[in-house]
């Protein structure tokens, strides 16, 4: 079972012009995947944001984290989220996480410069899938009380998807 809003990641690239569903989705998997309960996508780096984007979107993010201008290590998940999805919104959402996840996720977002894009995973374990969906949707429901649904702009309209993507 997998969950991903970006369908391009799960398509069979050799048959992209086919109209048959079975030709468009992965039919086989890497042999080494048998050794794992869950597989997540390769992480992408968020460092190296063009200066024009920082100037356009990131003024408040720079005020919160000025070292991001001088060092890629300062361009953390938190910095990138502040820049594109509203300054401070990630911190507000993190405060709504259960205690068991809050500190680790806060540390992750303030120190890491890459994450597994697409909120995608494959798992053979119903327990893992159910726990993940329970935790992420309970958290997102709590976030609705703060952010609501009257959000404007691409980065804010899709904020719930972007929160879940970082949580994975």
What are these regions (language model features)?
Residues 1-168:
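ER/Golgi luminal nucleotide-sugar-dependent glycosyltransferases, focusing on the catalytic module
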